[in-house]
């Protein structure tokens, strides 16, 4: 099975996001990308939407519920939100939705900054392996992978998807 082209997915996601925002009567959303791949997707999506407003970035490393098991990611950076969260309509963007735990962590962090009017979740890929009841409002594609497979977004330009085989990586 070949992996989809991120640029094509993002073009369609922009169409779907416009429709979603119009249905909800949201005219000035604030974009937030989850590091790292979600930031790349958010930048491309915001460009496709013709929106030049400042974009926020979240690093959810300290908010993950598996922090004590997996340890801290070696490249933790501070989150940057160049706007108030309180009362804003937010578009939260991630590259790959798997268990839902990254999104849960992102929502926890966002609410530490204030109470948004709404959060629209946008994901490039859903791996259909959810452990939490989290579903994107706008989705590029759903992929079903074997238990030993993962997908990684590379970028920032051009964006590309690569399949990773955890079984062969652990055999090394």
UniProtKB/Swiss-Prot annotation:
S-S pairs: none
Entry's Gene Ontology molecular function annotations: uracil phosphoribosyltransferase activity
Motif PRPP-binding: chain residues: 90-102
Listed InterPro entries: PRibTrfase_dom, PRTase-like, PyrR, PyrR_bifunctional
Keyword terms, alphabetized: Glycosyltransferase, Transcription, Transcription regulation, Transferase
SUPFAM superfamilies: PRTase-like (SSF53271)
Biological processes, Gene Ontology terms: regulation of DNA-templated transcription
EC number: 2.4.2.9
Catalysed reactions, semicolon-separated: UMP + diphosphate = 5-phospho-alpha-D-ribose 1-diphosphate + uracil
Keyword Transferase in record: yes
Keyword Transferase: yes
Family: Belongs to the purine/pyrimidine phosphoribosyltransferase family. PyrR subfamily.
NCBIfam families per the UniProt record, alphabetical: PRK05205.1-1
Function: Regulates the transcription of the pyrimidine nucleotide (pyr) operon in response to exogenous pyrimidines. Also displays a weak uracil phosphoribosyltransferase activity which is not physiologically significant.
HAMAP family in the cross-refs: PyrR (MF_01219)
Name listed for the protein in its UniProt record: Bifunctional protein PyrR
Species this chain originates from: Pseudomonas putida (strain GB-1)
Organism placement in taxonomy: Bacteria, Pseudomonadati, Pseudomonadota, Gammaproteobacteria, Pseudomonadales
């Amino acid at each position: 099975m070949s992996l989809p082209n991120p640029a094509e997915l993002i073009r369609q996601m922009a169409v779907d996001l416009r429709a979603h925002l119009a249905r909800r009567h949201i005219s000035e959303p604030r974009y937030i990308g989850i590091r790292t791949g979600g930031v790349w997707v958010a930048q491309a999506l915001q460009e496709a939407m013709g929106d030049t407003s400042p974009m926020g970035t979240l690093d959810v490393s300290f908010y993950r519920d598996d922090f004590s098991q997996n340890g801290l990611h070696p490249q933790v950076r501070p989150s940057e939100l160049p706007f108030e969260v309180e009362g804003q309509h937010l578009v939260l963007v991630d590259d790959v939705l798997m268990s839902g735990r990254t999104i849960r962590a992102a929502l926890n962090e966002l609410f530490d900054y204030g109470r948004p009017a709404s959060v629209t979740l946008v994901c490039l890929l859903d791996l259909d392996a959810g452990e939490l009841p989290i579903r994107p409002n706008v989705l590029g594609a759903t992929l079903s992978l074997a238990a030993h497979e993962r997908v990684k977004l590379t970028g920032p330009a051009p964006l590309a998807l690569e399949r990773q085989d955890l079984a062969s990586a652990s055999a090394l």
